[in-house]
A protein has these predicted regions:
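Loop/helix patches that line or flank the sugar-binding groove of alpha-linked glycan CAZymes
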Residues: 1-149
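Short, polar loop/linker segments at the starts of domains and inter-domain junctions
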Residues: 5-14, 159-171
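Solvent-exposed beta-hairpin/edge-strand motifs
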Residues: 145-159
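C-terminal beta-strand-rich structural cap/linker in extracellular carbohydrate-active enzymes
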Residues: 164-184
Length: 184
C-alpha cells in the first residue's frame, strides 16, 4: 500500500503516506466482510516500487522490522483499528439481510461516506455506531443522526476502543482524509 500511495500521489511526504495508509485501511476494516492486509502494511512496508516482487530477491521481499519502530504511530493506529473491529459485532455481520436491515447510508458530498449501524439489533453494546470517511483534503462537517451525547472512538490519527472525547453537540468536523467513528 505504501508503494502504491507513493506512486499515486505526486510529492507525498512519509507522513502523508502514513495518513493515507491509515485512512485506506480504516475503510476496509470498518466495512462488513473479512478484511485483508499485506504483511508489514502496518509499518508502511515498501518493496521500493517493485509491483511484481515474486521474482525479486530477498532484499526486496524481506520484512524490514526496524521500520516498525520508525512508524510506531501507524502500527498503533492499526492495533487500535483491529481492536475496535474485534470489540464491536456491528462490524462483523454475517448475512446480507442483517446488513441491509441495520446499516443506513447518509447522503453527502462526493468525498464523504457516512453510515450508521444499528448495534443493538446485532448484539453490540453500542446502540448506534456512526462511521464517517472523509476523502477530501479539507475537514468536513457532518450532522449526526441522533440527538444526545456521542463517544468518539476514532478521530484523525487515533482509534481504538476507548472514548477519545464525548461530544454533546449534533455536529462534528471530520479531519481531512481520515475516518471518524462515534457510538451511542
Amino acid at each position: 500500500l505504501a508503494d502504491k500511495l507513493t506512486a499515486s500521489v505526486k510529492g507525498i511526504s512519509p507522513a502523508g503516506v502514513a495518513q493515507l495508509s491509515q485512512f485506506a485501511t480504516s475503510i476496509a476494516f470498518l466495512s462488513q466482510g473479512v478484511p485483508f492486509m499485506q504483511a508489514g502494511q502496518e509499518f508502511l512496508r515498501s518493496k521500493n516500487g517493485d509491483d511484481n516482487s515474486y521474482k525479486s530477491n530477498d532484499a526486496t521481499n524481506s520484512i524490514k522490522w526496524s521500520t516498525k519502530l520508525k512508524y510506531s504511530s501507524t502500527v498503533n493506529y492499526y492495533k487500535g483499528l483491529i481492536a475496535l473491529r474485534a470489540a464491536h459485532p456491528a462490524f462483523r455481520m454475517t448475512t446480507t439481510a442483517a446488513m441491509k436491515a441495520n446499516i443506513k447510508f447518509f447522503k453527502g458530498s462526493d468525498t464523504l461516506i457516512a453510515y450508521s449501524i444499528n448495534g443493538k439489533a446485532v448484539g453490540d453494546k453500542a446502540k448506534t455506531i456512526v462511521v464517517i470517511h472523509n476523502a477530501d483534503t479539507a475537514g468536513a462537517e457532518f450532522t449526526l443522526p441522533n440527538s444526545g451525547s456521542w463517544n468518539i472512538l476514532a478521530k484523525g490519527s487515533q482509534i481504538g476502543t476507548k472514548t477519545l472525547q464525548v461530544l454533546k453537540s449534533g455536529k462534528v468536523v471530520v479531519p481531512a482524509q481520515s475516518t471518524m467513528v462515534l457510538k451511542q
